[in-house]
Amino acid sequence: MHPTTLMYTSSLLLMFAVLLYPLLVTFTSLPLNNDWASSHAKTAVKSAFLISLAPLSLFLSTGMEAVTSSWTWMVTTTLDITLSFKFDHYSIIFIPIALYVTWSILEFATWYMHSDPLMNRFFKYLLTFLVAMLILVSANNLFQLFIGWEGVGIMSFLLIGWWHGRADANTAALQAVLYNRVGDIGLILGMAWLATNVNSWDIQQMFILSKNLDMTLPLLGLILAATGKSAQFGLHPWLPAAMEGPTPVSALLHSSTMVVAGIFLLIRMSPLMENNQTALTLCLCLGALTTMFTATCALTQNDIKKIVAFSTSSQLGLMMVTIGLNQPQLAFLHICTHAFFKAMLFLCSGSVIHSLNDEQDIRKMGGLHHLAPFTSSCLTVGSLALTGTPFLAGFFSKDAIIEALNTSHVNAWALTLTLIATSFTAIYSLRVIFFVTMGTPRFLPLSPINENNPAVINPLKRLAWGSIFGGLLVMLNINLFKTPVLTMPAELKLAALAVSILGLLTALELATLTSKQFKVTPLRTPHHFSTSLGFVPAIIHRQIPQLSLLLGQKIASQMVDQTWLEKTGPKAIANATTPLASATSNMQQGLIKTYLTLFLMTLVLVTLISTT
Amino acid sequence: MTPTHFTISSAFLLGMMGLAFHRTHLLSALLCLEAMMLALFIALSLWSLQLDATGCSTAPMLMLAFSACEASAGLALLVATARTHGTDHMQALNLLQC
């Protein structure tokens, strides 16, 4: 085996071994010591990150990609499935970033979940999730990817419902499972079509063998899978509801890793989508609608975690738009940079929430710039990176996407929506910073504001370095697959920056109006639309069960059971015959003697007449 | 009318008059019913003898079987009447007539 491939494969094997060892320790019946979480789990992830830097550096210096097929899992007459790992540009760059972010989140979680008696179980769940995510990202065939896909779905369910005594948490976990399941139908449709038409689930074989086939149906299935897992419009309500889980869960699953799994699937399958204009247009319009709708919903939320969740959803829509522009690598870049600043935003939220004694409403925060300076600074850096401030992490990916959007022959409506959503990003980011860090405190005086724990400071510091330099580092070291358009009118080049600054100025103006009564009777309808999340959860979560129950009642019970099997069958005979029988018996009065006498007399008459 | 024809017809008619003009007991009506059946049996038996028609030889047996069923049904009704009304007097059966 070539030494580079050997290095890749052995690094991945070592990573899995390092990550699985703490989990295997928990399966023995020995009781865990109290700091198992920090001594074993966090150290395992840190070691795995350092191990993953080896393939990364090798890839950056040689640019070599590899595919490893090892153990033959199943051999059927037509389909072979082997354990197969793909070390390409996407997985080699994503795995270190995911491990870096997870390391920071686990260290933060040792502080955040310190008072939880089941903290070790929490870390076990997070580690299991991480292993499933790595399986998903490094999979070379769809079967292995599906294993990772389902794994992250289940761990998401378990982690969202962590505080399962709370009914809202259980509802949110159920929503996550149901919406992901609808997406899984699409994935299974795609897999079934590919297995029956292309006869393989290996990525390389699929790409070659599907050159001349019409791939619309499996691509629609894969887009449905991405809609479910990455919370695109239509299957999006689970993502804001998933904020019921603890903040480390939100930071890891629902900002950096799990929700990008759907986009990652589409990026892996992008060669199939290159020539299919239907699929590309669908991705574009769906992504544009998602990013606009969720940015609108984020404008008026009052829970800090919900604002960040909608921000995640909006950025996922932007990634979907990028895929619709046939630029999968830019979407991947956005995944990588987004992981840094979004995880940091969630960790800052977690620090603020714990500091204010579990207060999550931004209307009851304020003035934290002086009281928790480090957290506020990280919040500001993260928000600036999110809005695409030049030369921070988000700029390199987001600006590249907007430029590609502006210079391609694309749906003008999708373009408009994306630009408006970009300006909304600036608006709600400023709203968060204004309410949380600026102004005067609106919380109780005796709040345990303490950010001096190194378990809080170090993760935030690491992610802040990532948010500032991550984009630059990634961009400097990769080769772009598609040549970007480098010449465009100045207005298009500055479009992203211009709309963000416009949004920022609007938000500043609105922020100064919070202490003045601008309108005597405010316009409440758009506010209600935005706060109630577009009424989508309120309508859909009631309408669909009601339709199902009505269907059950009308068709199963009333139509089949009562009508066909009772009234038109056995009871019909009884209901038709009973009136006849009662009429007949009412007519006969029972005067037998009279009847018989008359009968006799007529008989005698007949006899006499016949004989004479 | 031949004497045989007259005899059987008059036997049948007499039985029917007894059935129609019964006064008190249901049992006497049932006995007259049996008499009618007997007359019909004799008539059917003489039919094949007088007309030399061997094809109708089985008719009397069938007739007898059905009359036995009918007699048993009548007796069951008599027993049921005796159980519900206490007697088999004919006046008792008309009590609840509307």
Swiss-Prot record, chain B:
GO molecular function annotation: NADH dehydrogenase (ubiquinone) activity
Transmembrane segments: 1-21, 26-46, 59-79
Claim: tRNA processing is one of the keywords in the record: no
Catalytic reaction list: a ubiquinone + NADH + 5 H(+)(in) = a ubiquinol + NAD(+) + 4 H(+)(out)
Keywords from the named record: Electron transport, Membrane, Mitochondrion, NAD, Respiratory chain, Translocase, Transmembrane, Transmembrane helix, Transport, Ubiquinone
Membrane topology listed for this record: Multi-pass membrane protein
Subcellular localization, as worded in the UniProt entry: Mitochondrion membrane
Lipoprotein keyword on record: no
GO terms (BP aspect): ATP synthesis coupled electron transport
Source domain of life: Eukaryota
GO cellular component: mitochondrial membrane; respiratory chain complex I
EC primary class: translocase
Main location: mitochondrion
Assigned EC number: 7.1.1.2
Functional note: Core subunit of the mitochondrial membrane respiratory chain NADH dehydrogenase (Complex I) which catalyzes electron transfer from NADH through the respiratory chain, using ubiquinone as an electron acceptor. Part of the enzyme membrane arm which is embedded in the lipid bilayer and involved in proton translocation.
PANTHER family: NADH-UBIQUINONE OXIDOREDUCTASE CHAIN 4L, NADH-UBIQUINONE OXIDOREDUCTASE SUBUNIT ND4L
Protein family according to the UniProt entry: Belongs to the complex I subunit 4L family.
Name recorded for this polypeptide: NADH-ubiquinone oxidoreductase chain 4L
Organism: Gadus morhua (Atlantic cod)
